[in-house]
Amino acid sequence: MSIEPQKPNTILVGRKPTINYVMAALKLLNEEGAPEVVIKARGRNICNAVDTVEMLKNLFIKNLVIKKVNIYSESLDSEGKKKVSAIEIVVAKG
């Protein structure tokens, strides 16, 4: 498992309520002027990441553009035997 530093415009979606991640993305896009936001999740939290983007798009930012979706697997152990699915969704204002 490789640990890489996260960019400041990255949101890691976990078990908190979805609205928390929506508000974090809104803050990055509106107040901090980030050109794009990367929403990442692994395993069971992938559905929360998708819900976050859908809430942003349908309720808050009508011209939200989904620039890129990357689906991949990450190794959980050094041998690479255990893997977990992951998703990265890059969004920006249109």
From Swiss-Prot:
It comes from the Archaea. Keywords: Chromosome, Cytoplasm, DNA condensation, DNA-binding. Pfam families: Alba (PF01918). It is found in: Cytoplasm; Chromosome. One of its GO terms (molecular function) is RNA binding. GO terms for biological process: chromosome condensation. The keyword Repeat does not apply. The keyword DNA-binding applies. One of its GO terms (cellular component) is cytoplasm. Belongs to the histone-like Alba family. Binds double-stranded DNA tightly but without sequence specificity. Involved in DNA compaction. This is DNA/RNA-binding protein Alba 1. It comes from Aeropyrum pernix (strain ATCC 700893 / DSM 11879 / JCM 9820 / NBRC 100138 / K1).
